[in-house]
Every structure is written in structure tokens, then in C-alpha cells.
Amino acid sequence: SLMHAAKAEQNHHGQTKDDVFLCIPPLYHTGAKMHWFGSLLTGGKAVLLKGTSPKTILQAVSEEHCTIVWLLVPWAQDLLLALDNKELDIADYDLDQWRLMHIGAQPVPPSLIKHWKEYFPHHQYDTNYGLSESIGPGCVHLGVDNIDKVGAIGKAGYGWEAKIIDEQGETV
């Protein structure tokens, strides 16, 4: 299961040994670290973040040269609010290397990602679901090429099959 999770993450997000993955707490939840497994598979580095404030996140991305950050909706919203309210200025941070932000575990409002892209237009984005249900991240994910479909559940991930059934168990 763990090896498949690593292969799925690497397939979905193209991690290389040069990536630096920001692991955000709580580390007792598998999502905080299993999304890093694609980087682990390729020899990529992880940074363990202490705290989830917008300033802490941006400082870590800047100082540690993080390329991939996994967030939850509230953390992304808090970060955008801090930027909107001019509490933080992205010009104060070295963020050019940051290439991918992905979210999972809960519905993602399309307006959130649209707003995110206003500040970070070069970022790839993915939504991941199914970690708790399947012992591996990305059993269902949006896919980095499908940002126009944010809000949808996504597609079956690498090595997974999925089907939609009705109340009688019939494929629809």
C-alpha cells in the first residue's frame, strides 16, 4: 500500500529528487506525510513545518526553497486573507521555485482556487481525495491538467479503478 501511494503521488505530481515538499502538521494524520511519498520515492527532501499560520507557511517555502505544498482549505483561505488584507506581501518572500499546491480531504470551492491563481498564476494545482478510505493518497484526484474542473470529485488516480453506481448497485 505504501509503495503504491508513493508511485501514485509521483505519477500525479511529477516529483523529482530536486523537489522540496513542505509537510504541514498534524503529522498524526496520514495526509500530512503520505503526499510526500512521491518525493520520498525519488529521493526528494521534506521540510516539517511547525504551525500553520500564513506567515509560517510562506517563510518556510521561502527559506527552505519548497517546491510542493499540500494544504487544507482553511489554511489556503487564511493565507489568501492575509495577502488580501496586506498583512503579508508575497514580494517579501522567495517563492519562484514553488510549483505545486494541492488540497484534499474536503470539498474545494472553485472560487478559492480562482483566487489562489490571482496570487500564484504559475502554480500547478491538484485536489486529492480518498486517503482515509483507501490507505493511499490520490485514489481519486482532479489532475494538474484539469484546473478548470475544480469542484468536481476528479478521476481515478494512478493504479486505481472507479465506477459510479446507483442505489441498486447498477453502473450509471
Give, region by region, the residue ranges found by the protein language model.
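Alpha-helix capping/helix-boundary segments
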Residues: 53, 74-76, 108
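Gly/Ser/Thr-rich phosphate-binding loop
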Residues: 41, 66-71, 80-148, 158-161
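AMP-binding (ANL) adenylation modules
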Residues: 25-28, 133, 170-171
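Active-site phosphate/pyrophosphate- and oxyanion-stabilizing loops and adjacent acidic/basic residues
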Residues: 7, 77, 114-115, 151
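Conserved AMP-binding/adenylation subdomain of ANL enzymes
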Residues: 3-20, 28-68, 82-83
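Conserved beta-loop-beta connector loops within the AMP-binding
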Residues: 163-172
